[in-house]
């Protein structure tokens, strides 16, 4: 089956940034998981963070959830400590994200922000500053 949806993913300092767009199926989720793992390789067994932009994301099919759930386990097992999700209030997005990613597990913490600046401020306060001038996304 053809992948549906799009993403940009890039790294800045010890932060993996991603922008998701469109409605996602299992194939797009797998492509994202594979690219995410590749980009995160330099941080494995260290402490790192993630920020994801979800305003243009239109949710995922039920089949996509198992792929993302496996990715969530992988990132936490490999040193992810903070995740900032950026999107305007949406009960559907919140439901799907809450289903896939717990708010906290051991020393991992996830927070949701309306504004990018709030997410950057929180990550910086937590020890993960982002230099916006260094954003180099790779797209799918």
Regions of interest found by a model, annotated:
Residues 1-140:
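Amphipathic, Lys/Arg-enriched alpha-helical "gate/interface" segment within cytosolic domains
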């Amino acid at each position: 089956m053809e992948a549906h949806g799009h993403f940009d993913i890039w790294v800045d300092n010890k932060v993996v940034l991603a922008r998701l767009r469109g409605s996602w199926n299992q194939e797009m989720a797998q492509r994202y998981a594979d690219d995410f793992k590749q980009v995160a390789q330099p941080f494995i067994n260290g402490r790192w963070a993630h920020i994801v932009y979800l305003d243009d994301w239109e949710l995922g099919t039920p089949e996509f959830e198992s792929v993302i759930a496996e990715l969530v386990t992988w990132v936490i097992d490999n040193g992810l400590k903070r995740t900032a999700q950026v999107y305007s209030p949406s009960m559907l997005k919140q439901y799907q994200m809450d289903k896939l990613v717990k708010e906290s597990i051991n020393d991992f913490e996830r927070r949701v922000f309306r504004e990018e600046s709030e997410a950057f401020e929180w990550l910086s306060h937590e020890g993960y500053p982002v230099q916006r001038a260094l954003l180099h996304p790779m797209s799918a």
